[in-house]
């Protein structure tokens, strides 16, 4: 099974287009991969202003421009998952958390774990495949329950998950 690694910031419409484009090129099954970040909560405007003010001196010293305020992209991982369900994808993989899995019946679900606790959470959520990510993988860590340091276990340590 191949895995279609579509962009994290892929809108639901772009995701649908990408799925259909892959289907035009192959009849083989493939998976969609999404990031499932934990909710970060709301940032108080006053706290944001304080942080911007504190960082301003560093931006001045380094001759960096004042960054544009972040703007939401107008869609959620739930919107992406609705497309996955509508398109009747055979498989879905995700990392950085456990997305809402309701409405994904019949889709093989694969989640990333960097610790035994995360593997247990994925199993409890009902995923079909737990993909353990040892520190040997390099790059970003798919941790979502554990601290960064706890997520640095090697693959051999995770083999019993």
PLM feature spans:
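Active-site entrance/lid segments in N-terminal catalytic domains of soluble metabolic enzymes
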Residues: 1-161
